[in-house]
Amino acid sequence: MLEKTMNRRTMIKGAMAAGAVAGAAGMALPSVRPAAAQDNLQIAFSVPGLNFPFFVHMMNLAEQHAAELGGIDFIPLDGQQNGAPSSTKQTADLEAMIAQGIDGLVISPNDVAALAPAIQSVIDAGIPVVTVDRNVTDVNTLAHVGADNVEGGRLQGRYLIEILPDGGDVYELQGQPGATPAIDRHAGLDEVIAAQDAVKIVVSQTAEFARDKAVTVFESALAGNPEPAAVVCANDDMAFGVAEVAQAQGLSIPIIGFDALPEALIAINDGSMAATVEQFPGGQSTQAIDILVDYLLNDVTPAEHDTYLTPILITKDNLSAAERAVEAGVGGDATPAA
């Protein structure tokens, strides 16, 4: 596999060198991207599940960016099986990509521990890998691009303290166990809440980033505990589930999400959600593609292995700062901050 990838890269570089000679002779320079379809770079992009709007957006922006660059056969890989993210399915997809002989892989692993061996197998086959959103620390990947999810959790915690000046009991809905964003967002939130005494997390349970599970978890929590002063969720999908229950039961409580999905921006605008955290998933996926392509074509290894975009808190006061604000119909001028 390494030989196949290197042959393709050598051929592309040969075309570039020939172009330089042609340019010196006054001839038109060819694109640095291979023109013929059979010379295209084959890049696979794997996500835990396209049943999550977050990953749909990430995939769409990556595919759009690959098309803009040109010379790339973009291969989308959906890791869900039977309607849910599956490490087994994602592993099988990677095995198929090794057999197919792709040139590079961008992946957001469903479970970082479960996918680590499969990702290492891809690397051992001579295929460079860039992780996006979810980092795998024990595997020798080319690079990782993500958001600072610990800081995102801190933003949620600081906002809770701001809107609850007299304190209060808060429910927390955590994300999928084993997913680094879920782990990091909880850590950031816990760090801020633990540093003061007024706001307390009295219920902290996983709803696995899923709206339907959030409905069940929140209903169960309400049945056994006093009404919370606020609810903080590790993603917007869970916040939507909480909002659904709150509306059905006539509760008026601040609900804080994470991801800045268009539906969340609309909900913040109409008052059914209080805030969300923007982590610029489109910025993450396009930067991951850029790093991989630059390595494949130019042998450029990033100076830093990890690239983290700085998340921002989105409330009704700054809706236009969200990456998908225009899509949501609330304006937009966001620029990802590294």
Locate each region found by the language model.
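Flexible loop/hinge segments that line or gate small-molecule binding clefts
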Residues: 104, 112-151, 162, 169, ...
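Hinge/cleft segment of the Venus flytrap/periplasmic-binding protein
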Residues: 39, 173, 177-181, 192-193, ...
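N-terminal secretory signal peptides
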Residues: 1-10, 14-32
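C-terminal segment of N-terminal export signals and the immediately downstream linker at the start
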Residues: 27-43
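Extracytoplasmic "Venus flytrap"
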Residues: 42-61, 65, 69, 75-91, ...
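Hydrophobic alpha-helical segments within soluble ligand-binding/sensing domains
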Residues: 89-90, 145-170, 184, 213-215, ...
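Short, solvent-exposed amphipathic alpha-helices that sit
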Residues: 54-68, 152-159, 180-199, 213, ...
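Hydrophobic alpha-helical
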Residues: 95-99, 103-123, 189, 203, ...
